[in-house]
């Protein structure tokens, strides 16, 4: 069964074609800068990485270009569109409407659109991908896999905000959490890797990259997570502020006469590592600047790492302990110094990092704690596309995802 996995952003489409029975990636790549004059497609072909300029005006055009590439004589891996059995979509926000992946139909589409209000930056472009497939491959079944679904097992005490209750009852204002597909994958995979059952295990999954979130997973279920109504809450991120006093935002809005749109832009695109360091949102560039003595770069790294440590400690307390800590995401998988600095203050909980194993690990599955550590600390590369493909396969075959 060949499953095309799509992740549509505002000006991009990432794709992966997976032969799911054999767990084999047939093709992967992405189109960027949709609607701009310098739009391009990049993809892997054998051991080569290829980039080509394209004239692409919208997501329909982008998906047509992807399908043309998949069936081209020069770079294709399939002969005909009919070899695509299903399409799995990453959908960012499912609100309280979806607690698992679903077959996309008119009713599901209507519910995705109902979430536009709480996910204005993400759901409309996810929907554009669904619409594009409906236009280009109308006979192919589609499945929606929601970032928020894994977190629907959180109890009310974890997801409610201490605001007047009517805003939850009438407007759905609550914590939803994100990166759920990644947290679900790594929390399951780490148990397979260690040869243990999820039942009875307390796991903290740290998805740390340009965006970042942490989830408390107990008995295989999410019971709390750091992101909130939107992906802005929680950790300090590349350009997102994470946790901040709402009073500080109101103060700035009043003093500088900022609109809600201005503030949305500030907390999402001008803050975080980039905002504090003044260097970049790229961890590699900030680390290089810090090594050269840039004080704001040093401060931004210290803030970034401290906030991860705080959430790990808080979630360990919430669960009454922790058995496994997992690092994933671009920084979590590849930045050994971040992992070490996050875990160092956790020694009081019995966390002991094996410095040699940690330094040697650059994105491979592996244990980076010592044999004597009371808590297993493990690096697990995330694979959201695989998870989306597996859910799609299950639904197409009539099984529970």
Predicted feature descriptions by range:
Residues 218, 223-259, 265, 329-360:
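Catalytic phosphate/nucleotide-handling subdomain of diverse soluble enzymes
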Residues 69-84, 190-197, 312-323:
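Phosphate/pyrophosphate-binding loops at sites that engage ATP/ADP/AMP, CoA/4′-phosphopantetheine
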Residues 298, 302-322, 326, 332-401:
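Internal helix-turn-beta structural module
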Residues 9, 89-92, 208-210, 322, ...:
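Glycine-rich beta-strand-to-loop/alpha-helix junction loops that act as flexible
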Residues 70, 74-122, 143, 149-158:
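Short beta-strand-loop/turn "lid" adjacent to the catalytic site in phosphate-handling enzymes
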Residues 150-255:
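Glycine-rich phosphate-binding loop of actin/hexokinase-like ATP-binding domains
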Residues 265, 272-276, 283-318:
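Adenine-nucleotide phosphate-binding core of ATP-dependent small-molecule kinases
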Residues 1-95:
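N-terminal glycine/serine-rich phosphate-binding loop of ATP-dependent small-molecule kinases
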């Amino acid at each position: 069964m060949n499953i095309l996995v799509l992740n549509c952003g505002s000006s991009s489409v990432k794709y992966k074609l997976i032969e799911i029975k054999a767990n084999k990636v047939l093709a992967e790549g992405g189109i960027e800068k949709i609607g701009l004059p310098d739009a391009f497609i990049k993809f892997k072909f054998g051991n080569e990485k290829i980039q080509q300029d394209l004239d692409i005006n919208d997501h329909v055009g982008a998906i047509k270009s992807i399908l043309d590439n998949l069936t081209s004589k020069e770079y294709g891996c399939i002969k005909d569109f009919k070899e695509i059995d299903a399409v799995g979509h990453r959908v960012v926000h499912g609100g309280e409407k979806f607690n698992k992946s679903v077959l996309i139909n008119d009713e599901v589409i209507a519910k995705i659109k109902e979430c536009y209000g709480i996910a204005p930056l993400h759901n409309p472009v996810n929907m554009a991908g669904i619409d594009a497939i409906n236009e280009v491959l109308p006979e192919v079944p589609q499945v929606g896999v929601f970032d928020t679904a894994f977190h629907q097992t959180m109890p009310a005490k974890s997801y409610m905000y201490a605001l007047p209750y009517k805003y939850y009852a009438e407007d759905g204002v609550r914590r939803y959490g994100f990166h759920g597909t990644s947290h679900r994958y790594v929390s399951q995979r780490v148990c397979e890797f260690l040869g243990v059952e999820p039942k009875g295990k307390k796991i903290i999954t740290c998805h740390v990259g340009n965006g970042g979130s942490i989830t408390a997973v107990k008995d295989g279920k999410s019971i709390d997570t750091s992101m909130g109504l939107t992906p802005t809450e929680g950790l300090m991120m590349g350009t997102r502020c994470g946790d901040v006093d709402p009073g500080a935002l109101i103060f700035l809005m009043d003093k500088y006469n900022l609109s809600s749109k201005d503030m949305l832009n500030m907390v999402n695109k001008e803050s975080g590592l980039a905002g504090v360091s003044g260097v970049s949102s790229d961890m590699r560039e900030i680390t290089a600047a810090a090594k050269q003595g840039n004080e704001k770069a040093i401060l931004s790294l210290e803030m970034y790492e401290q906030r991860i440590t705080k959430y790990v400690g808080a979630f360990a307390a919430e669960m009454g302990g922790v058995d496994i800590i997992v690092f994933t995401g671009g920084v979590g998988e590849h930045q050994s110094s971040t992992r070490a600095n996050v875990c160092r203050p956790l020694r009081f909980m019995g966390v002991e990092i094996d410095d040699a194993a940690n330094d040697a690990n650059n994105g491979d599955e592996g244990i980076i704690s010592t044999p004597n550590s009371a808590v297993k600390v493990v690096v697990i590369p995330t694979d959201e596309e695989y998870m989306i493909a597996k859910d799609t396969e299950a639904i197409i075959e009539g099984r529970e995802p």
